[in-house]
């Protein structure tokens, strides 16, 4: 099982390959705001653990194992962003909040959050009811 740091790299590599068709060390470093040497070390570790295949100066490709995990990590991130929007978290805070919690939730918790997101999305009245509860709570606290 990948560590949270490994997950961040796999997720970013998956997104870059999906967007550009490839992922270079420099692109990964820029996206994660880390030094290229840190990326090289992690990519070598991910290669050793068979999440990707890395050839120096030639680039990297995700293995089927890496693609599967990358897809699941992107799903988790997007789902948590959806959840944050539904519960009314300010848009400017969503990314950092998701980054702060995504590695600490079990996949069972993610699946249950997915159920909850689906529940709210099936009927807009449910979201409106939640907004009413939130408004009432805000008025009580003021």
UniProtKB/Swiss-Prot annotation:
Record flagged with keyword Isomerase: no
Record entry for activity regulation: DNA binding is strongly activated by Mn(2+).
GO terms for biological process, alphabetical: intracellular manganese ion homeostasis
Residues that, per the record, bind Mn(2+) 2: 11, 77, 99, 102
Localization (cell): Cytoplasm
InterPro entries in alphabetical order: DtxR_MntR_Metal-Reg, Fe_dep_repressor, Fe_dep_repressor_sf, HTH_DTXR, HTH_tscrpt_reg_MntR, Iron_dep_repressor, WH-like_DNA-bd_sf, WH_DNA-bd_sf
GO molecular function, one term: DNA binding
Cellular component annotations (GO), alphabetically ordered: cytoplasm
Protein task: Central regulator of manganese homeostasis.
NCBIfam families in the record: PRK03902.1
Protein name as it appears in the record: HTH-type transcriptional regulator MntR
Organism encoding this protein: Bacillus anthracis
Lineage: Bacteria, Bacillati, Bacillota, Bacilli, Bacillales
Gene name of this polypeptide: mntR
């Amino acid at each position: 099982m990948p560590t949270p740091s490994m997950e961040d790299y796999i997720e970013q590599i998956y997104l870059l390959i999906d967007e550009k068709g490839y992922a270079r060390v420099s692109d990964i470093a820029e996206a994660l705001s880390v030094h290229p040497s840190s990326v090289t070390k992690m990519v070598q570790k991910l290669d050793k653990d068979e999440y990707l295949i890395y050839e120096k100066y030639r680039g990297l490709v995700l293995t089927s194992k890496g693609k599967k995990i990358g897809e699941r990590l992107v799903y988790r991130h997007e789902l948590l962003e959806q959840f944050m929007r539904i519960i009314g978290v300010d848009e400017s805070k969503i990314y950092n909040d998701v980054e702060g919690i995504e590695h600490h939730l079990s996949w069972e918790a993610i699946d249950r959050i997915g159920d909850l997101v689906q529940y709210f999305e099936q009927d807009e009245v449910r979201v409106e009811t939640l907004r009413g509860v939130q408004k009432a709570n805000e008025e009580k606290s003021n």
